Design a protein with these regions (language model features):
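Boundary at the C-terminal end of the N-terminal hydrophobic targeting segment
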Residues: 20-24
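Extracellular/periplasmic periplasmic-binding protein-like sensory domains
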Residues: 238-313, 370-372, 376, 381-386
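Beta-alpha junction/loop-to-helix N-cap segments that form part of ligand/metal-binding clefts
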Residues: 26, 30-32, 46-53, 60-136, ...
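Extracytoplasmic ligand/sensor domains, especially the bilobed periplasmic-binding protein
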Residues: 53, 97-201, 250-275
Length: 386
């Protein structure tokens, strides 16, 4: 006679117990990640390559091999056109409607900075943003992708002022978070050598006429002129410099701009431009990881030519997969963070061995290149900034 009351009590306990909520974006069958990116506007090519031909390329390989602990990875992307306000709206939609597990490889300092606080409040991981502002450093739910501007600046100034002994520097920069973060870093690092920027000129995003800025910089007669721009204005600047016959300055491209396709927009006006490259040559490198990337690109996207942007996205997909595999079958946002923090000496076959420290940065190096006939000629081995 005591069995029935006991069963009723047990049933009440079970039904009354709080249920453990499923982790957003994670089911028995899949993991959903997404991002707001530029699929239109000045960085459309970059956005498409780092996501649809980069991250998604690596996830195709993973999914065809059985997924991550049996789960396939699915991606959701929205276009922000490099507009911060659209990036905010897209990111909220991804989190609140699509219930993504994490945001992966969003692009551009202004859009990324605009969404940063929201994602931190929601405790949603922002993984490997393709931007350079140091504002992402050391945040629990952010793992930075690209070499940050202050690290890039340190490598650039140490090489140009320290090794090559240039003394007079100027900068043409984009008037936003991207440009200003580099400008501040250049001033700080030049100060270590008792130097400063002797001239600076700013441009707005999307500008097509930079003739006035180039004329003013030319008049300052710098030995080195930094280009802290997106591709369109950079091409206009290089063509204008060629047009006025300005040959006695070394044009130096920042890492986010240093790609053959984008510098080729300036055609032969890009010859002789130097800069900090963040990725090995995707077409010719014999590094094992780059060879695999090329083989997978040929298999899955045979019409898409290998490039540094899709290689960066492929690398981001690799790091996400490594973190999620380490986190185990019981994947949560916090377990992913802990797993990524455990990466030490990870061999990717693409970049030097990776250790992720408290700063959550995944890239702290670059190497110096010069544009010759629309290709990069390496001038140094890896330069590092610790």
């Amino acid at each position: 006679m005591i069995v029935r009351p006991f069963l009723l009590l047990l049933l009440a306990v079970v039904l009354g117990a709080p249920r453990v909520a499923a982790e957003p974006g994670v089911t028995d069958a899949e993991i959903v990640v997404g991002g707001s990116n530029s699929f239109s506007g000045p960085l459309a090519y970059t956005g498409e390559q780092i996501t649809k031909f980069g991250v998604d390329l690596y996830f195709k390989v993973v999914n065809d091999a059985g997924g991550i602990h049996g789960r396939k990875v699915r991606t959701v992307y929205y276009d922000d056109g490099y507009r911060p306000q659209d990036a905010v709206a897209n990111t909220k939609k991804l989190v609140e409607q699509d219930n993504v597990f994490a945001i992966i490889i969003p692009q551009g300092s202004p859009p990324v900075v605009a969404t940063l606080e929201y994602l931190e409040q929601q405790k949603v991981p922002m993984l490997f943003p393709y931007q350079s502002s140091p504002v992402t450093r050391g945040r629990r739910y952010v793992f930075q992708g690209m070499t940050l501007s202050d690290r890039s600046s340190r490598m650039m100034i140490d090489y140009l002022a320290g090794t090559r002994k240039f003394k007079k520097f100027a900068a043409l920069y984009q008037d936003d978070e991207y440009g200003k973060s580099f400008l501040a870093a250049f001033e700080k690092d030049l100060g270590r050598y008792g130097l400063r920027l002797t001239a600076t000129e700013s441009v707005k995003r999307g500008v097509t006429d930079v003739s006035a800025q180039i004329a003013k910089l030319h008049a300052a007669r710098p030995e080195v002129t930094f280009l802290v721009l997106v591709p369109g204005p950079a091409a206009h600047a290089l063509r204008e410099r060629q047009k006025i016959g300005w040959t006695d300055t070394l044009m130096v491209s920042t890492g986010p701009l240093t790609d053959e396709k984008y510098l080729a927009l300036a055609t032969d006006a890009a010859n002789g431009v130097e800069g900090l490259s963040l990725w090995p040559d995707p077409m010719t490198s014999d590094l094992k990881g780059v060879q695999l990337y090329r083989a997978y690109m040929l298999k899955y996207f045979p019409k898409n030519e290998p490039n540094r942007y899709s290689l960066a996205g492929y690398f981001a997909g690799m790091l996400f997969t490594e973190g999620a595999m380490r986190a185990g079958r019981n994947l949560t946002r916090d377990s992913l963070v802990t797993a990524l923090e455990s990466i030490k000496g990870f061999e990717t076959g693409i970049l030097p061995p990776l250790t992720i420290g408290p700063d959550h940065e995944t890239q702290k190096q670059g190497f110096w290149v010069r544009v010759e006939n629309r290709r990069f000629t390496p001038l140094t081995d890896w330069l590092k900034s610790e």
